[in-house]
C-alpha cells in the first residue's frame, strides 16, 4: 500500500502532514521558548498533585471497595430517629423525558408480506440464537434477517432506490468533494485527556453485535478499476458506475494519481432474500438486540460450529502459548494491505477479520467465555454442557450491556442526555417497543463517532514502551498482526489518550492511496466519503429534516443553522449544496457543536439515545428486567452491576493492573495508585451456585 503521509510529525499542529518538504525554521534553544516555562509550571503542579494523590488515595484496595458518590436518585436516606429507608428512593425506573416517535409508514411492510411464522415457548429462559421470540406479541421483531427500523420514511429520487437529488433537481455534490471542502487538512492534533483510545474499538465491537448488512452481489465482485465508466458509447450505464463516488481532477490527494472514481458497493436489498419491498429495504443479518450474537452467532448452525460441546466451552486454538478464536478456512478476507493473512478467525460475526480492533475484542470475549464456563462448571459440577454454555452465554450478553450502559454511553452522551433518553435506572420491559436498530442510527448517527478514530494505534510492551505504531488502514484485514501483540495492543489503547472530538476525521482514514494488484493504476479509500454515500444509499432524510424530527428548529435558510454550526462552515455548505434542505445528515451531525457534556451534537444524541432506549426497554431479556422466565435474580443483577471492562481484560490477558473506569485515560507514570492489581477484578459467581 502506498500512503501519502509520513509518520506523524509531532512538531506539527496537524495529526498528519502530506508529503511536502517544508524547510524548518531556525530553532531557538528550547529553554528560551515560552512553552518550556509553561512546561516547568505544569510539571511542578503535576508532581504536587501526584504526591497528594499518593498520600491520600487507597493504594492496595479493591476496585469493588471504593466508596463512590452515588447519584441522588440511588441514594439511601436515613432518618436519625427511625433509621428507615426513604421509600421514594427504593426503586428508580428508567423513564425518558424525551421520546421521538417513528413517523415512518413502512415499518410493518416486511411483517405483513415476508415474515416467517414463528412458534414461541413463553417459558424459555434463554434467548433464541436469531433473536426471534424475544417479543411474544411480535415474535419477529428484532430478529436476524428482518429490516432495520425507520424513524422517517426513506428518501429516494424515484421513490424506490435511486439516490436523492437536490431540491432544484441537480445531483447531490460528490461525497468526496463535500469532505475535501469542509474538512481537508483541518484535523488538529488534540487529545482527549479524560478518555483513552479504547472507546473506538468498543464502539466498533458493539456495532457488530447489532448490525450487519452485506454488499449487493450486483457490484460486490466488479473490478476495482472503473475506467470503463467513462466510455461514452455505452448504451447502458453499468450498475457500479451509477453509485461510484466522483473525484475532482484537482483533488489535493488523488489528482496526482489520476484516481477519478471510488468504487462504492451498495447494501444488499430485501429482494435478494426473496422479499421484494418498496422502497428499497435493507435487512439486518444480525440480531437487533445487544445479546453477544457477534460472539456466538445469529443462527444455530453458526453457534453450534463454534462450540466444543464439552463443559460449555467455545472452540479455540493455541498460538504462541495464547488462546485465540479457531481458524476459519472459508473467510472472505484473506488479502490485506500488508499482504495475505494466514490467520483467519471464526466467530459469530462474519466480519471478525475486517478490523484488528474487532478481532481483539472477539478473542477477548472468547477467552472470557471459556474462563466463566470453567468457573461455573466448578461451581455446579452436575450441570450439563448445554446448561453451562447457555448460562455463560447469558452472562456474557449481560456483561456487554452493563459495560455499554454504565461506562461507554455516559461518556458518549453525557449525564444529561442519558437521563433525558431514559438510559439510566431500572429497566421496565415494554412489549409495545420495537428494539430494531434504526436505519438513521446505523447509516448516520453512530457513524459520526468515526471522528474519534485516532491517526495511529500504539502497541506497548509490558514496560510501557511503544514497540510499534500502526495506521488504522494497516490493521484492516490483517488479523495475523494480533498474534503475539494481544497484550501490547490492549496496553496501547489503555495508555494512549483518545482523539479529541472535532468535525473532521483524521487524514489517515480519509486519504488512503493503494496500488491496484495486477493493474497499472491506483485507487483509494476515504471513510468519510463512504459514510456520506452510505447515507444516500440507504435513503436517509437530509439533515434539516432530521434535526426538526429531533425537536430542533427547522432551518429555512443556511444562516438558521448558526445555533449549532459555525458561520465558517455554513459558508462552505452554501458553496456545496443548493439549499439548506439538501445537506446530508451525517454532515450536519459532524458539524453540530456538542452539548451537555456529550461528545455529539443534539441531533446525533437524539438518534443514539432513541436507539439505546429501545434496545433496553424493548428487550425482554435485558439484564435488569425482572419478572420474566429469563430474568436474573436480584443477587445476580447486583453482581453484574459491579463488572467493568477491566474485569474482562484482566482475566483474558496478561495485564497486571487496571483502572476501574476502563475507558478513562489513566497515565501509569502519574496515577499508578488508581490502577489496581488484576487479582481484584473477579466477578462474584456465588449467586449462580445451585443448591440441590
Language model segments and positions:
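N-terminal accessory/cap region of cofactor-dependent oxidoreductases and related radical enzymes
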Residues: 17-371, 375, 394-529, 533, ...
Amino acid at each position: 500500500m502506498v500512503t501519502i503521509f509520513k509518520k506523524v510529525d509531532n512538531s506539527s499542529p496537524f495529526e498528519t502532514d502530506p508529503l511536502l518538504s517544508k524547510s524548518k525554521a531556525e530553532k531557538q534553544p528550547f529553554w528560551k521558548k515560552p512553552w518550556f516555562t509553561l512546561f516547568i509550571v505544569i510539571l511542578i503542579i503535576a508532581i504536587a498533585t501526584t504526591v497528594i494523590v499518593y498520600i491520600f488515595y487507597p493504594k492496595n484496595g479493591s476496585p469493588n471497595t471504593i466508596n463512590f458518590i452515588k447519584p441522588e436518585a440511588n441514594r439511601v436516606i436515613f432518618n436519625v430517629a427511625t433509621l428507615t429507608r426513604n421509600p421514594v428512593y427504593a426503586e428508580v425506573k428508567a423513564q425518558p423525558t424525551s421520546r421521538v416517535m417513528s413517523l415512518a409508514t413502512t415499518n410493518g411492510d416486511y411483517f405483513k408480506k415476508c415474515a416467517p411464522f414463528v412458534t414461541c415457548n413463553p417459558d424459555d429462559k434463554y434467548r433464541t440464537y436469531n433473536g426471534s421470540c424475544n417479543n411474544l406479541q411480535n415474535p419477529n421483531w428484532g430478529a436476524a434477517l428482518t429490516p432495520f427500523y425507520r424513524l422517517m420514511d426513506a428518501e429516494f429520487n424515484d421513490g424506490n432506490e435511486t439516490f436523492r437529488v437536490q431540491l432544484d433537481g441537480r445531483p447531490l455534490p460528490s461525497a468526496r468533494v463535500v469532505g475535501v471542502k469542509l474538512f481537508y487538512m483541518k484535523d488538529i492534533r488534540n487529545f482527549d485527556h479524560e478518555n483513552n483510545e479504547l472507546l473506538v474499538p468498543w464502539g466498533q465491537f458493539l456495532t457488530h453485535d447489532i448490525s450487519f448488512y452485506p454488499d449487493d452481489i450486483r457490484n460486490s465482485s466488479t473490478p476495482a478499476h472503473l475506467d470503463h465508466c467513462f466510455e461514452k458509447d455505452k448504451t447502458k450505464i453499468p450498475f457500479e458506475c451509477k453509485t461510484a463516488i466522483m473525484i475532482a481532477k484537482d483533488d489535493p490527494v488523488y489528482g496526482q494519481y489520476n484516481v477519478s472514481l471510488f468504487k462504492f458497493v451498495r447494501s444488499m436489498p430485501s429482494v435478494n432474500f426473496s422479499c421484494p419491498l418498496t422502497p428499497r429495504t435493507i435487512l439486518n443479518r444480525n440480531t437487533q438486540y445487544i445479546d453477544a450474537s457477534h460472539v456466538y452467532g445469529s443462527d444455530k448452525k453458526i453457534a453450534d460450529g463454534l462450540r466444543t460441546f464439552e463443559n460449555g466451552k467455545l472452540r479455540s486454538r493455541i498460538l504462541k502459548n495464547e488462546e485465540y478464536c479457531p481458524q476459519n478456512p472459508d473467510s472472505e478476507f484473506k488479502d490485506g494491505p500488508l499482504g495475505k493473512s494466514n490467520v483467519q478467525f471464526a466467530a459469530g460475526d462474519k466480519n471478525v477479520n475486517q478490523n484488528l480492533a474487532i478481532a481483539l475484542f472477539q478473542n477477548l470475549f472468547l477467552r472470557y467465555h471459556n474462563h466463566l464456563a470453567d468457573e461455573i462448571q466448578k461451581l455446579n459440577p452436575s450441570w450439563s454442557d448445554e446448561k453451562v454454555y447457555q448460562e455463560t452465554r447469558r452472562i456474557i450478553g449481560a456483561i456487554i450491556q452493563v459495560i455499554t450502559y454504565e461506562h461507554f454511553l455516559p461518556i458518549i452522551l453525557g449525564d444529561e442526555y442519558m437521563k433525558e433518553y431514559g438510559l439510566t435506572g431500572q429497566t421496565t420491559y415494554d412489549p409495545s417497543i420495537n428494539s430494531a436498530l434504526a436505519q438513521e442510527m446505523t447509516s448516520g448517527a453512530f457513524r459520526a463517532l468515526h471522528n474519534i478514530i485516532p491517526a495511529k494505534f500504539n502497541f506497548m510492551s509490558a514496560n510501557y514502551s511503544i514497540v510499534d505504531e500502526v495506521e488504522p488502514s494497516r490493521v484492516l484485514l490483517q488479523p495475523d498482526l494480533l498474534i503475539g501483540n494481544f497484550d501490547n495492543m490492549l496496553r496501547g489503547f489503555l495508555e494512549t489518550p483518545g482523539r479529541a472530538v472535532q468535525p473532521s476525521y483524521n487524514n489517515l482514514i480519509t486519504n488512503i492511496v493503494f496500488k491496484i494488484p495486477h493493474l497499472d493504476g491506483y485507487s483509494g479509500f476515504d471513510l468519510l466519503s463512504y459514510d456520506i454515500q452510505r447515507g444516500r444509499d440507504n435513503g436517509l432524510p437530509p439533515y434539516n429534516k432530521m434535526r426538526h424530527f429531533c425537536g430542533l428548529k427547522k432551518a429555512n435558510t443556511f444562516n438558521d443553522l448558526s445555533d449549532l454550526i459555525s458561520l465558517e462552515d455554513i459558508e462552505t455548505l452554501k458553496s456545496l449544496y443548493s439549499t439548506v434542505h439538501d445537506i446530508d445528515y451525517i454532515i450536519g451531525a459532524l458539524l453540530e457543536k456538542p452539548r451537555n457534556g456529550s461528545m455529539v451534537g443534539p441531533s446525533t444524541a437524539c438518534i443514539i439515545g432513541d436507539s439505546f432506549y429501545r434496545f433496553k426497554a424493548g428487550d425482554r431479556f435485558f439484564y435488569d428486567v425482572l419478572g420474566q422466565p429469563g430474568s436474573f435474580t436480584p443477587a445476580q443483577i447486583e453482581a453484574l452491576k459491579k463488572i467493568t471492562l477491566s474485569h474482562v481484560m484482566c482475566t483474558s490477558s496478561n495485564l497486571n493492573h487496571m483502572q476501574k473506569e476502563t475507558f478513562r485515560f489513566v497515565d501509569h507514570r502519574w496515577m499508578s495508585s488508581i490502577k489496581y492489581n488484576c487479582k481484584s477484578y473477579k466477578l462474584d459467581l456465588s449467586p449462580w451456585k445451585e443448591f440441590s
